[in-house]
């Protein structure tokens, strides 16, 4: 994504996003079904700084391949805890003016479930129901229960580079 100043979207009247719009159009035109698109740092950055761009990106990606072919990624190795991105995705909705003008569909609860994990589970042939039943007492579940008992206060800490002085 090009560096955009506040108040700029980099999107023309037709909704064109350089590279993304053309790529999505090619996918739709060819009917290719073996492509999965990943939401990573571009979602995190755009949802915070350029919500209109984020709305167009999600609208175009989901329109091109369907919510069943979009997977969640966070680039957390570079940015620390992904919780802030997950919370943003759970709350974000494509703005209604974009839905009306460009025909983007609202992001449904089912879309979010697919994107946040069910699509990846399907790709890796993981039976989600069986996996939930198989690990009720594992260390991760015990940490989750302790976290819930402590009041479920998520960390929104971001990590990054620090300039040497």
Predicted regions and their residues:
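His/Asp/Glu-enriched, well-ordered alpha-helical/loop segment
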Residues: 66-134
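Active-site microenvironment of metallo-dependent hydrolases
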Residues: 120-165
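Catalytic pocket-lining loop regions of alpha/beta-barrel enzymes
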Residues: 1-72, 80, 97-108, 146-164
């Amino acid at each position: 994504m090009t560096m955009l100043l506040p108040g700029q979207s980099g999107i023309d009247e037709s909704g064109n996003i350089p590279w993304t719009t053309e790529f999505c159009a090619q996918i739709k035109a060819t009917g290719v079904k073996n492509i999965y698109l990943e939401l990573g740092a571009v979602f995190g950055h755009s949802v915070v700084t350029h919500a209109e761009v984020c709305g167009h990106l999600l609208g175009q990606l989901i329109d091109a391949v369907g919510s069943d072919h979009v997977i969640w990624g966070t680039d957390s190795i570079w940015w620390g805890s992904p919780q802030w991105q997950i919370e943003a995705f759970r709350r974000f909705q494509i703005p209604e003016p974009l839905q009306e003008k460009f025909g983007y569909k609202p992001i449904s609860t089912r879309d979010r479930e697919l994107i946040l994990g069910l699509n990846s589970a399907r790709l890796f042939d993981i039976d989600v129901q069986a996996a939930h039943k198989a690990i009720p007492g594992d260390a991760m579940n015990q940490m989750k229960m302790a976290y819930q008992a402590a009041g479920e206060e998520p960390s929104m800490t971001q990590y990054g580079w620090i300039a040497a002085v």
